[in-house]
Amino acid sequence: YDMHFFGFQDDNCAVGLVLAMAKAMKDSGYQPENDIVFCLHGAEEWGASYSQFDWTVGAWEMINHVHPEWVGKTLAFINFELPAYEFDTYTTTYSAPEMFAMLDYFANDYAYAPKPEGCFADGVLTEGYQTYTYSDDFSYYAAGVPSTVNGFLLQKDMETVFPFYIDYYHTQYDNPDTYNEAVMRFNIAYYGALAMYIDQMPATDLDFTAQAARLTAAMDENVMAQAGADVEAYKAALTALEEAATAMRAKVVEVNRAYETAREAGDDAAMAQLRETGRALTSQNLEAFRYAQKHLLGLMYERPIVPHEAPQETITLCEAIIECLEDGDPATAVDEYAWTVNNVLEWYAMYFSPEVIAVQDDMNWGADNQDNLYWGTDINFDKADVDAATRSLYVRYDDKGGDFTEEIAIYEKAIEVEKAKLAAKATAETEAMQALAALLK
């Protein structure tokens, strides 16, 4: 029921895929090692008023209020969006970073992974693509459940949307004319096989070296040091996490590969022993996964980040703006930097009144609205207070060579506030990495 116009690809085809996969497993007589739940969530497009996080509400309610006990027990949530459309010559899977290695092995080395036929001529790319917030899997991911979704939104650069989103998305043109049977057949087979692979392997394959790589990529050592963060302690915690994660992954791979060998040989006794060993590793890894998302996953509104990236990014942008203003160049400041502050929320400050922005801010950060944030609960960033300067620069766009003392003062004050935030978040992340490494040992 939750769709725009026909909603054929988005998301009736996904509903059809889930039901077809359930029927195929049932008709084939497949006996899973674990419970496999087929779940269709409502309120995916919209489900709340006066909230900046008003989509994927049904999924958030399911994992947080209806079945919170699934966290720590669920091996994976496999989600689907627009699954019967050929977006390009390749396809991908978006996921939690900890699942990148498992998805790469499944697509490229696992003997029973289906290959595309009649679609996706360049195959399944497995460079590692972090899930975004535009689908139900993010609600599960943020809650601590390993999650995936077929690559439906962004091209492989993970910045540019597919043309579908310009031509058809949320319009009456998302209709049965877009259907590609070969794509649908492939997605049913591929993700059905992935579900069975995850179900059958004794140890859930989560690779926390990818989490360490994510944290490393998010570091700007110069800005962090400038803010007073203990960069050396942060890097030491990263090293400890990488070591613990590498050792844990080696255990998981050893158990799972041995299980595959025993299965091919029909060695039931070895399989039973490996499953027992894998069960303990799975429990340990799922707890570590939950902890990692609780402490190391943040948002800049709808963009997933490492928490310290928000103040780090703001400091960098504010410094660039100040440099432009000291050169008397407001046009460059506006065109290249000012509108991008606060994850482009400052663009709205340029074009809407302070009263409108106050409502938007209240929806995000108002004390009385914190129980209305859904998948943004406890992980949204703190906005930098630069609206007045943003608005002023937009008005003074053509004032080349002018005096921007007042605007510079606003950005300088913001930098000092953001430095304190950055130092605090770096400390919290250092402690979280240390705790995560301990969970993996």
Regions found by a protein language model. Give the residues of each.
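Secretory-pathway/membrane protein signature
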Residues: 1-441
